[in-house]
Amino acid sequence: MKTRAKRFVSALLAGVLCLSLLAGCASKKKELTRYSTVFYDVFDTVTQVIAYCESEEEFNTQMDALHADLITYNQLYDIYNDYPGVTNVKTINDNAGSAPVEVDDRILSMLELADQMYQTTNGKLNIAMGSVLNIWHNSREAAEAAETDADNKLPTMEELEAAAQHCDINNVIIDADAKTVYLADPEMSLDVGSVGKGYAVEMVCQAAEARGLTSALVSVGGNLRAIGVKPDGSQWTGGVENPWSSSDVYTSDSMLDGAINMSDMALVTSGDYQRYYVVDGKRYHHLIDPDTLFPAAYFNGVTVLCSDSGLADCLTTGLFCQPLEDGMKIVESLDGVEAMWCTPDQQVITSSGWDSHLKK
């Protein structure tokens, strides 16, 4: 009995000691403070970050690194500009039909994701459509420079069909061992606008987590990615812009009802209201259907919620360019992926698990 009593007292003392140590550790742990910042110089859009850190110094260090990472990805995925010492997607396009280009792993992995998503989306996400997308890009640029909408022009079907002859994704030759990319068709080009930003956001957020950031909400042009939860244990929340009442400034009317709970999740939207120009009173947006070579007309907006921003970015474009039934089959076949479709007759349709993420 004495032995058992001694063991009990020893265990009790050890327990008290552990509790004291834990209490001491808890009291020493600094309270996290909310900070925020904005960047304007990456991916031709606005980047906003809200994060909780132990000090402003820690926050600034994290944001300097995150900003630098975004700049790097922006340069790597750029199809319009050259940068000193940087081999980017433009370099690949410039060497189409000429020679393989040795590229950074961050380009390889992004292109490999895009190739996988080409299969997943029934070919609706096709980064090899650069020749067609460039025609539409030039038409939008000309419209922006025009004094009135009356001067705006549509591309001709003849030029679009001619460009479409150079969009075969099988001519994008990726050699993972040699770390090279080769475009076998000299007239083809890559356009990674449907994957680059989302993939960059995912990689940048993963890097921030690896540096110790535990609680943040990152928005790059509306591509939302949540890191962890808030210090009080509550989840971050995201909203879906109302495609029928969109605005440059968020208001109650510009957002659809129903905030989305987000913890280590991404929320990405593609919409016909984001980038467009007007011809004869009709809006022509930037999301081009590979089958028609014209802006897809199935939806006004498609939003995807999942754990990976790159995947979400690819899916929003792919789903936007195909009928609801086909898109729903894709979403329901993917674990941890939910979607919302906003139709031209102002219906909101969601996948089976969407409502489980709504903030109560």
What is each residue range found by the language model?
Residues 2-11, 18-360:
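Mature catalytic core of soluble alpha/beta enzymes
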